[in-house]
């Protein structure tokens, strides 16, 4: 039996709270069960040097975890003087995923930075970050359309992300920490609304997985992402 007696294809309760902070152009608190991430979007009327004069915009992301977001206190990366490899990998994943949902030429020569700060971690922080940052990005871009800065909305699709894995030989969706730490296979899937995949990150931590198991995990991820898209749409409709 899974924690909280969830079905194998059932994500944790998902909640998206928009306009969570007052200064950012977009801000969201996203919750997947006990995992909670604050996602904020900042618009700047400039682009990185390598894009100057290219008539296109840029979307990037930063990711971090509060020291006591985990069971025991983590040292702040700022105190260490550098970001860890895991942090860099995750923020690049978030940025790639969000760029896929935006027509960067239609965005014009401006940048949007998504800051994803984990305030409580119980597994799936990177997938929760992508899911929440997507909504924060939509709000930031909607503001640019509303104030006349943009004539056309450059959003092509929502994006959602979810973890899937094999725990005790059983494929399951949206792993929390106790499942993730015991999983034989762990996979993160990022998806567009039409079902196309932006990223699939999968690793056999124990026994290698079969082609059939891979297809089962991808089907679980697609089903889970469709539920997430419904939550995102409902949040954006409020």
From Swiss-Prot:
The keyword Magnesium does not apply. Phosphate binds at residues 86, 124-126. Keywords: Nucleotidyltransferase, RNA-binding, rRNA processing, Transferase, tRNA processing, tRNA-binding. Coiled coil: none annotated. PROSITE patterns: RIBONUCLEASE_PH. Its EC number is 2.7.7.56. Pfam families: RNase_PH, RNase_PH_C. The keyword Nucleotidyltransferase applies. InterPro entries: ExoRNase_PH_dom1 (IPR001247), ExoRNase_PH_dom2 (IPR015847), ExoRNase_PH_dom2_sf (IPR036345), PNPase/RNase_PH_dom_sf (IPR027408), Ribosomal_Su5_D2-typ_SF (IPR020568), RNase_PH (IPR050080), RNase_PH_bac-type (IPR002381), RNase_PH_CS (IPR018336). It catalyses: tRNA(n+1) + phosphate = tRNA(n) + a ribonucleoside 5'-diphosphate. GO terms for biological process: rRNA catabolic process; rRNA processing; tRNA processing. Belongs to the RNase PH family. This is Ribonuclease PH. It comes from Pasteurella multocida (strain Pm70).
């Amino acid at each position: 039996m899974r924690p909280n007696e969830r079905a194998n294809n059932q994500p944790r309760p998902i909640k998206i709270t928009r306009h969570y902070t007052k200064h950012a152009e977009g801000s969201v608190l996203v919750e997947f069960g006990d995992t909670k991430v604050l996602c904020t979007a900042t618009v700047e009327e400039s682009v990185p040097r390598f894009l100057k004069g290219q008539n296109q915009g840029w979307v990037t992301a930063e990711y971090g975890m509060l020291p006591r977001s985990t069971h025991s206190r983590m040292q702040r990366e700022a105190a260490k003087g550098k970001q860890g490899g895991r942090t860099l990998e995750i923020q690049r994943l978030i940025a790639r995923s969000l760029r896929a949902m935006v027509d960067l030429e239609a965005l014009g020569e401006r940048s949007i930075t998504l800051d994803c700060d984990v305030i409580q971690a119980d597994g799936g922080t990177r997938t929760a970050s992508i899911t929440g940052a997507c909504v924060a990005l939509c709000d930031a871009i909607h503001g640019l359309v509303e104030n006349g800065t943009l004539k056309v909305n450059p959003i092509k699709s929502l994006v959602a992300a979810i973890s899937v894995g094999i725990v005790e030989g059983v494929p399951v969706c949206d792993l929390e920490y106790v499942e993730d730490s015991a999983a034989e296979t762990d996979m993160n899937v990022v998806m567009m609304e039409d079902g196309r995949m932006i990223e699939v990150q999968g690793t056999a931590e124990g026994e290698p997985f079969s082609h059939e198991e891979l297809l089962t995990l991808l089907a679980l991820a697609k089903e889970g992402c469709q539920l997430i898209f419904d939550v995102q749409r409902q949040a954006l409709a409020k």
